[in-house]
Amino acid sequence: LVAQVEGGDVVEAVLDLGRAVLAEGGPVDAVGITNQRASAVVWDRATGEPVGPGIGWQDLRTVIDCLTLGAQGVRLAPNLTATKAAHLLDLADPDRTRDLCIGTVDSWLVWTLTGGARHVTDVTNVGLTGLRTADQLEWDQRVLDALRIPTAALPEVVDSSGVIGEATALPGAPPIAGILGDQQ
């Protein structure tokens, strides 16, 4: 099963909806983001453009990668973000020399809504990446090394509630005051 996410289309839909709601209802105190967890998007830090289509959580193209890693002692399921992000990096930057950002859909939306000011995700989204230690307190260097994922490409992990930035891409630049992955 192949399930791709066009990052630009997702952002345009969010911006169109946000602008329409704000035009109809007027200013808001804050906005929040909710999304399907475990989908992966990779974008260029300088241009803010996706380097290709993202991969949806249900995509199974990295099953063989998961089996290979499992034989090496790194156990990951194909519905996690980890191997999807590595696959996208392999396609866009096999030598890992570009300055790219990796994120789930919430990270991509926050990046775009804040004009590139914030590269973050929340604890509900990071929990389904496969890139954190079992206690979810830090990035799992063993997994990052196995997948050749640079730590600098990863988002900062923030609380699910609290102001994390201004949505300057929307009229009135409302604060983004919450991120929450689905099924919470």
List the model feature ranges, each with a label.
Residues 64-68:
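Pocket-flanking alpha-helical
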Residues 39, 48, 62, 110, ...:
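Surface-exposed, flexible loop/turn segments at secondary-structure boundaries
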Residues 72-183:
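Gly/Ser/Thr-rich active-site cleft segment
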Residues 7-10, 14, 62, 81, ...:
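Conserved donor sugar-nucleotide recognition element shared by glycan-biosynthetic enzymes
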Residues 59:
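Carbohydrate-associated surface elements
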Residues 1-51, 98-99, 159, 172-178:
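N-terminal glycine/serine-rich phosphate-binding loop of ATP-dependent small-molecule kinases
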